Amino acid sequence: MAKLSKKMKIAVGLVDKTKLYPLQEAVDLVKKTSITKFNGSVDIAVSLNLDTTKAEQQLRGAIAFPHSVGKPIRILAITDDEKAALEAGADFVGGIDKINDIKNGWLDFDLIITSPKFMAALGKLGKLLGTKGLMPNPKTETVTDDVPAAVRAYKKGKKEYRADSFGNIHMSLGRVDSASNHLVENALALLDLIKSRKPATVKGIYIKNIALTTTMGPSLKVKLPD
């Protein structure tokens, strides 16, 4: 096991590993214990009681956070109405030409938004796009009849969420220099959404654990807000 740096030892020493921190206290402390020189990310991990081998328990969708989570994303809009997509804020626009660019190895974007018309062509790139989490999906509203509206929503801060194979959802809530109340409100928005999407087939405890951390800093266990 790698030795902890002096800064990390001090940061770890400020955290009570046996404590479930109220959300506001956790946010304040996780910002304080970030040890990066740059403006790191404040991240949340939510562990859910899901059996992801069952289709109805595979949580995936999109959330419009109340506050910016920081890093802007590069959007590729694959659409017939390129002008409207550009005006909405898309970084790249095109049709089959852009799909061919992807086929030839171009991946300088973070998100694809498209209309159903182009999904057959994109589907042929499933192995490439799927492994990188770039395949558009109706559940995340990245396959839509209104591409410009989706572009505007994602440019304003809408983000995809997805439970991994172990039932965990990991997301950034903002940056270390974000206002604490903004981080709290983003966390509450995500937790409220997760609660509202509880599959009917889940029995017993649904949200098992919540943790906050930064790009480089100790993890804090968080009490589920009422």
Curated annotation (Swiss-Prot):
Q: What is the lineage of its organism?
A: Bacteria, Bacillati, Mycoplasmatota, Mycoplasmoidales, Mycoplasmoidaceae
| NCBIfam families referenced in this protein's UniProt entry, alphabetically | rplA_bact (TIGR01169)
**Would you identify the family this protein belongs to, as annotated?**
Belongs to the universal ribosomal protein uL1 family.
Question: Per UniProt, what is one Pfam family of this protein?
Answer: Ribosomal_L1
- Detail the disulphide connectivity of this chain as listed in its UniProt entry: none
The entry's protein name is: Large ribosomal subunit protein uL1
UniProt-recorded Gene Ontology molecular function terms = rRNA binding; structural constituent of ribosome; tRNA binding
Recorded hits in SUPFAM superfamilies, A to Z, give: Ribosomal protein L1
The subunit structure is:
Part of the 50S ribosomal subunit.
Provide the function of this protein.
Binds directly to 23S rRNA. The L1 stalk is quite mobile in the ribosome, and is involved in E site tRNA release. Protein L1 is also a translational repressor protein, it controls the translation of the L11 operon by binding to its mRNA.
| Gene Ontology biological-process annotations | regulation of translation; translation
Would the keyword Ribosomal protein turn up in this protein's UniProt record?
Answer: yes
